Regions:
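N-terminal glycine-rich FAD/FM-binding segment characteristic of electron-transfer flavoproteins
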Residues: 1-223
Length: 223
């Protein structure tokens, strides 16, 4: 999740006009350290879904759980990272939008709320698109959407008393058979380290180095 972008965007003292940030996370073993860090950055409260029944949940199952938790918060705008650092599917935010019946905009490099709509500069291979959609909406942001912010000592102390609502699958009204390994439509069959890359070749140019470069490019069928 992109905690800094959310807390910076809705900082009451910022030009964005203020607001309140509610964090929503799904994590094993009641893990709250990441949420506490984000609370220290300025978020008001958090919702944590943690349940042994979630072990083995795939992207769609994760989306179902997070959508149910987000629905409780009744947000005007849902911000998420483009993809997580574990599964890297990049599909969960748009699945959440579909489950909630909301429009979604991905790869946002700039986000601006204007009245009842949100304007987004969406990053593309050729540059960016300007997109506008009504609120509420789901927007996924890229790493450079804001400058990173860090929790202050005052924020760290304040975070200790901010509320974190702990929920289970049953609390969300979700059948345990729809999530976890039992409900997963994807299965990880193997996890293996990437093959080690061979050391590159250093070409010492004594007047004919370009010939070796041409030979190398021909081997790659570039020429």
């Amino acid at each position: 999740m992109s905690f800094p972008s959310r807390t910076r965007f809705f900082d009451p003292g910022s030009s964005a006009g203020g607001g309140e940030v509610t964090l929503v996370s799904m994590a094993p073993n009641g893990e709250v350290s990441g949420l506490r860090t984000a609370l220290a950055m300025g978020a008001a409260k958090a919702i944590l879904v943690s349940d042994p029944a979630l072990a083995g949940t795939d992207a769609l199952g994760t989306a179902k759980v997070l959508a149910a938790a987000i629905r409780r918060a009744e947000p005007d705008l849902i911000l998420a990272a483009t993809e997580s650092s574990d599964g890297y599917t990049g599909t969960t935010p748009v699945q959440i939008a579909e489950l909630l019946g909301l429009p979604s905009v991905t790869f946002a490099k700039k986000v601006e709320v204007t009245g009842s709509s949100v304007k987004v500069e969406r990053q593309t291979e050729a540059g960016y698109d300007e997109v506008e959609c009504p609120l509420p909406a789901v927007v996924t942001v890229t790493a450079g959407v804001v400058e990173p912010r860090y929790p202050s000592f005052k924020g760290i102390m304040a975070a200790k008393s901010k509320p974190v609502e702990n929920l289970t699958v049953a609390d969300l009204g979700i059948d345990a058979g729809q999530v976890g390994a039992a409900g997963a439509r994807q299965e990880i069959t193997d996890v293996a380290p990437a093959e080690a890359r061979a050391a590159g070749e250093i070409v010492v140019d004594e007047g004919e180095g370009h010939l070796r470069v041409i030979e190398f490019l021909e081997q790659l069928k570039v020429l």
